[in-house]
């Protein structure tokens, strides 16, 4: 019997090795690091020394029966992101002597959770931070939550008569809704609402820019973009507003160049075009006050600071500087008063504060043991595989001849294919096929254990790592908790939240609980590169192996679905105290199975009664005892009250 142990790369593994391997110091933005115990630590804000141990926090939450999978939201990080955004604009305003202010709004679509929006409004109150809404439902949220009469409520999206009427009348409540015209037919509805309600709204226009964008959301800009008015349509709209005596309510120009813009050059081009449109609107007689630069402010998911889809080649300060400088230059060249600048920076505000934690349920991997059988009793094609295995074993501890190893690996693959053909034709038994596969894995392991990282990544050998990789079964639904990973291949930082004093010598990916082949995580950040496997530890028996998915605060909860009827996870809001302790502010309990079924119009009582009738019939037919029936019904009723996720 031959045993194959996992390959260890270093004699001593350090915290610095883990930080480098998972690129934590790059994407973590100083909010996340590793403490002396080898656990992920979370910092109150980027200027603070106050930290808590994430692994310890999760263990203590478990003692309260708040179990993974769960979302942990750090209020202090959310506050710090809002502060950082405003501080960057304040610094840019001072540097460029800009003669107006920055006033941000948060796009509700990024995260509609009540506790989140309340905190954003609270933390941004000193700057009159507002909200951006894109539907009537979101409009109602904005009207209910925004109490600061100096805050703005930017009204985007498709607008029917009722939407416009609500926004128009809300102005009489002391609110500041600005109805942004995004479709030509909205002009007629606004004019009609003014005539019927005897009230006037604040009005804005969204422009379709011709500047080219980039990345996944590049089509948000251009002549064929979903929203906005072309230049001829803007001219016609201004004419109609003048004729309706509404030009004095025209206050805002809005544009949007897409989400997660990775290249600052794209932002600069759009700003130059939009600034000139703003200037021309002023010249046409509109008493403009605001320019809303929309969203697009990206974050560095992978820590590479490049223009890839998962990164940005600019900082928060670079962004603010370019916004302020470009708008100032255009206005001053035309003797136009500097406008108040608005941005709808959702992802940059909300992403960092949320961490999704899940536990690993188990693993699957190729067999670590090989039973050696006598060659005399083997068929020729299996004997060939066995010879290849012995040839590879002879190379152990010898000077590496890479071309020889590549040749032997190609032989092993060819012999395995021959075995598969023989099996299909009925010449090999199932046991013989199994032995052939084990021999192939054994060849791969011999090669892996004899080569360094650079050698094993040779194009002719790179598949060996994939062959030997483990699948880690995750107690979560990708479709519910991180749908962007499935839908658009978004890369999120994924890191074990403990055991960083140990070398993660396993290579693996994750499979979720759903019965769907797309329910896998197989794109990871590794030393700043995107790879299909992650460095992981071997789970310890009867101990949790806990993984964190970071920067998940934007869009994921809103977009998540009920695939296989896995519902919402536990959500916990945490404040970090000055003494490095924490306070649990809010707990939003996970969906029970009963609650999930109710969403689909299934009554738990009816389901239970239907099953009870079946058990009575089974008792009558002596297929089930009364005791078995009672136990079955008890388990069903208990299960309906419990989580849709797996428990211990």
UniProtKB/Swiss-Prot annotation:
Gene3D superfamilies: 1.20.58.930, Alanine racemase, Lyase, Ornithine Decarboxylase, Chain A, domain 1. InterPro entries: Ala_racemase/Decarboxylase_C (IPR009006), Arg_decarb_HB (IPR040634), Arg_decarbox_C (IPR041128), Arg_decrbxlase (IPR002985), De-COase2_CS (IPR022657), De-COase2_N (IPR022644), De-COase2_pyr-phos_BS (IPR022653), Orn/DAP/Arg_de-COase (IPR000183). Its EC number is 4.1.1.19. It comes from Prochlorococcus marinus (strain AS9601). The modification N6-(pyridoxal phosphate)lysine is found at residue 109. Pathway: Amine and polyamine biosynthesis; agmatine biosynthesis; agmatine from L-arginine: step 1/1. HAMAP family: SpeA. This is Biosynthetic arginine decarboxylase. It comes from the Bacteria. Substrate binds at residues 291-301. The lineage of its organism: Bacteria, Bacillati, Cyanobacteriota, Cyanophyceae, Synechococcales. Its cofactor is Mg(2+); pyridoxal 5'-phosphate. Coiled coil: none annotated. The keyword Metal-binding applies. Pfam families: Arg_decarb_HB, Arg_decarbox_C, Orn_Arg_deC_N. One of its GO terms (molecular function) is metal ion binding. Catalyzes the biosynthesis of agmatine from arginine. Belongs to the Orn/Lys/Arg decarboxylase class-II family. SpeA subfamily. SUPFAM superfamilies: Alanine racemase C-terminal domain-like (SSF50621), PLP-binding barrel (SSF51419). Keywords: Decarboxylase, Lyase, Magnesium, Metal-binding, Polyamine biosynthesis, Pyridoxal phosphate, Spermidine biosynthesis. The keyword Magnesium applies. It catalyses: L-arginine + H(+) = agmatine + CO2. One of its GO terms (biological process) is spermidine biosynthetic process. The gene is speA.
């Amino acid at each position: 019997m031959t045993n194959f142990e996992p390959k260890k790369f270093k004699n001593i593994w350090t915290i610095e090795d883990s930080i480098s391997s998972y690129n934590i110091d790059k994407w973590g933005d100083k909010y996340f690091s590793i403490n002396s115990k080898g656990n992920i630590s979370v910092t109150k804000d980027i200027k603070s020394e106050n930290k808590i141990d994430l692994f310890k926090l999760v263990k203590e939450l478990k003692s309260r029966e708040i179990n993974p999978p769960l979302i942990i939201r750090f209020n202090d990080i959310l506050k710090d992101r809002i502060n950082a955004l405003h501080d960057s604009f304040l610094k840019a305003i001072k540097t460029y002597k800009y003669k107006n202010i920055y006033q941000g709004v948060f796009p509700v679509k990024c995260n509609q959770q009540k506790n989140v929006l309340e905190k954003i409004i609270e933390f941004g109150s000193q700057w009159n931070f507002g909200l951006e809404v894109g539907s009537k439902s979101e409009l109602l949220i904005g009207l209910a939550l925004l109490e600061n009469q100096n805050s703005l409520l930017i009204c985007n999206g498709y607008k029917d008569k009722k939407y416009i009427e609500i926004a128009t009348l809300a102005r009489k409540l002391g609110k500041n809704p600005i109805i942004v015209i995004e479709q030509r037919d909205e002009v007629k509805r606004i004019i009609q609402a003014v005539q019927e309600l005897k009230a006037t709204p604040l009005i804005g226009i969204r422009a379709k820019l011709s500047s080219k964008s980039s990345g996944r959301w590049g089509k948000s800009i251009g002549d064929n973009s979903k929203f906005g008015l072309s230049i001829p349509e803007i001219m016609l709209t201004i004419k109609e507003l003048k004729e309706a005596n509404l030009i004095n309510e025209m206050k805002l120009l809005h544009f949007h160049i897409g989400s997660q813009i990775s290249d600052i050059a794209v932002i600069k081009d759009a700003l130059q075009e939009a600034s000139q449109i703003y200037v021309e609107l002023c010249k046409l007689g509109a008493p403009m006050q605001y320019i809303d630069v929309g969203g697009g402010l990206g974050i560095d998911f992978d820590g590479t600071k490049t223009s890839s889809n998962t990164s940005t080649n600019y900082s928060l300060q670079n962004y603010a500087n370019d916004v302020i400088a470009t708008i100032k230059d255009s206005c001053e060249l035309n003797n136009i008063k500097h406008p108040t600048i608005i941005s709808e920076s959702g992802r940059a505000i909300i992403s960092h504060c949320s961490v999704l934690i899940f536990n690993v349920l188990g693993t699957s991997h190729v067999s670590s043991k090989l039973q050696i059988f006598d060659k005399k009793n083997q068929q020729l094609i299996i004997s060939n595989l066995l010879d290849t295995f012995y040839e590879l074993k002879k190379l152990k501890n010898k000077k590496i001849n890479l071309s020889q190893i590549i040749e032997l690996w190609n032989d092993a693959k060819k012999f395995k294919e021959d075995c598969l053909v023989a099996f299909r034709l009925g010449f090999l038994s199932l046991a013989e096929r199994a032995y052939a596969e084990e021999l192939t894995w054994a060849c791969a392991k011999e090669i892996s254990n004899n080569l360094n990282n650079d050698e094993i990544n040779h194009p002719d050998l790179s598949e060996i790592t994939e062959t030997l990789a483990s699948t880690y079964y995750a107690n979560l639904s990708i479709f519910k908790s991180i749908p962007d990973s499935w839908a658009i291949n978004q890369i999120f930082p994924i890191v074990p939240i403990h055991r960083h004093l140990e070398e993660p010598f396993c290579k693996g990916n994750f499979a979720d609980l759903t019965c769907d082949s797309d329910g896998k995580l197989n794109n990871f950040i590794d030393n700043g590169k995107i790879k299909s496997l992650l460095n992981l530890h071997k789970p310890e028996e009867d101990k949790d192996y806990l993984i964190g998915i970071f920067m998940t605060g934007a869009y994921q909860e809103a977009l998540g679905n009920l695939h296989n009827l896995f519902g919402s996870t536990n959500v916990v809001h945490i404040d970090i105290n000055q003494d490095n302790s924490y306070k649990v502010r809010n707990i939003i309990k996970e969906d029970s199975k009963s609650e999930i079924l109710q969403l689909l119009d299934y009554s738990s009582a009816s389901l239970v009664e239907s099953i009870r009738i079946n058990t009575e019939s089974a008792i009558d037919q002596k297929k089930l005892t009364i005791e078995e029936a009672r136990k079955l019904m008890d388990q069903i009723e208990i299960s309906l009250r419990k989580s849709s996720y797996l428990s211990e």
